């Protein structure tokens, strides 16, 4: 072909390409005329079936015609401090700030959930039970022994717990009140009574005051999230489908899945030998994981895992969670009134062994009951069954010792210990005298009066007091105070004062207590001065967290950071800070900052320590995590990549095609997720406008619910890429570019990929794994438990423990 014919063909194809861009621009214009502002961020081109280049050309055409393209961030409603980036196409004349009216930002496609919403069970307004079916068991009749327990008649269709022996539930009563607590079956309810509610309130208290008042929110009448699938249906006598009265917040099996690390709040108050054992085990676990990642054969997979591993190590330095003790698990507590004071019904543990119970927030060793397991008790079997997934039964005396635990869904950490064969020794001391008989509601409860506008006001001793709105913040302060006092050797009387106040703080928002008076009565100000007061290098006096344990997660403000951090030669991270000024609501010029933690910002954890042995142990651990994070990043920087092979792409063309299709499907969720985030933001903003006094906890619940509903309505659902053996062959042969493989790794199950990329040749265990065996053994793990943790046989573990390998 001559030059002119080639030019002619090129012109035709470029004209066709330009036509496609023009058509896309016209389509987007039509969308704007119908909807207003539209999201044109990552993934929208896939929905339109065009390339990224075509999309960019179409947007350029529209910009030339006076349309605006603005970037911004949608705050992630359930992830404070994080945002989802958006790119919005706007009609001419639109100001940048208008994109932050999220209810006005629409999607190009009108999303509908393809599975008709089956992925998320939509919340239905609850069905109400008539109060004639309910009886209250007051304190004097034994209700105080089971406070918070809802006993329901077995075999009643509209009150079935399904496959569960127990569940944390909400039941609407008479349309305007509700019951909240732990539901269990009962076989001895009076005739005509289907539900018995146990309360610590005294006889004569009206039913309406025993029950909770329904919230004025049709999406969340209980002020608490009902779990996915927490509502169910049954077929009535007429063959009609009816909504059950039971609304589950959590059910049997949900509590046992919680993380089983050891928080510093508990471990730092135990013996130094136990602190060192569990921190060393946590460190050796991480070292073994690092060694395993370094042995991976695929460099792209290796880099991806090293990056997330380094982030995990940085996080571990801040959160200071040690390795779990053998068979340690969270369990929900239920009352067994016939249980002895030194016993526990715990079928997940061996009959006759001893266990420690730890509740969070944890005050100290005086709150830890050490109990003997008795799994032969008839009442235990009747209430919980023989095989409860994640519950134990204790009596009220032990619940009270656990800093006043309730039976309405409170959990404890159960740790087998202190028996003759156990290597685990948990320190438990006598209950503090100053806590005996202390009841937060009796001591600091008040009376409520409504004003002319229907607003509640709370009074105690004739004086009005304010209700707590920031439980988490206040709880954090008093927990840090107790930790600092314990490490610095406070007296039992001083600890009792702080713990009494912490008990009031825990209950203050829920039970409307006068927590400010508790602060005064317990002399909290003088305790803070004595145990947390310090003078800085410039001579300024401060109070606040004063030991490494409490300082690690303490908030600190840093200059606003832009973009991703760069990795220094030593593996540490450098951030680009910007000095942005703004005028606050008082007209003062302020510099924009963002939140970080003191541990994240220091290079040496010892700068946060006051010098106690426990703090020094934690400082060693934190520094080892920081060092390992840097080492992982250095390894990441020096790892190469698989060369892209065109011949491999041809050989594995079907696999490449399949992987591309799977990736397209996974990435197509991005616009839906952005739309869900903008919708949820708009919903929560409207709720906050209608209810300016919403607490942080209420906002969090509303956010979770709004996001779940928004994801359901637009069909946003993460789709994990499943990689076949043949597709993995294609990846290893270089048939997929590094950029595309990274995208695939971001949308697949990391553990499966790690297994595929781990070499199988050697049977000898790495030094890190051998060290981990030794550390697990020192912490009391059995041979079979160590074998399970490492994925090897018990005989292999025995050989290493006996020095035969």
Place the predicted regions along the sequence by residue.
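Beta-strand-enriched accessory nucleic-acid recognition/scaffold domains that flank the catalytic cores
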Residues: 2-384, 391-404, 416-805
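A short beta-strand element within the Helicase C-terminal
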Residues: 410-414
